[in-house]
Amino acid sequence: MNWQTFLEATIGQWELLVRLLVACICGCVIGVERSFRQKEAGIRTHVILAMASALIMVVSKYGFFDLAGTNMNADGSRIASNIVTGISFLGAGVIFVRGGSIKGLTTAAGIWATAGIGMALGA
């Protein structure tokens, strides 16, 4: 498969780069706030999460270009739905319960929201 032809037919290289860059910036903004509050997930986590979610959405939307016209059915929305499931497990990992105190709910919600922002930017 010629990747240059693939990118020109579906999404431009600059548009792909801008989408990933904006996802990086959005993840950085959320991560900076979490870092200033010295929470579990900081800048690096949120940037990686936003960029990975955006990239996965780009792949789910444009990655099955070579299957067009074949008998194979590809449903890119399945990939997106699994991002939500995976991020939910990641978010659950930062929630701690000690006695009657629950910590990490806001960070978990931030992780989930960051993934959603990345998905929206990649779609």
Residue ranges of each PLM-predicted region?
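Alpha-helical transmembrane segments and their membrane-interface boundaries
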Residues: 1-77
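Small-residue-rich segments of transmembrane alpha-helices in multi-pass membrane proteins
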Residues: 48-58, 82, 109-122
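Gly/Ser-rich oxyanion-binding loop with an adjacent helix/lid
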Residues: 88, 92-99, 106, 110-123
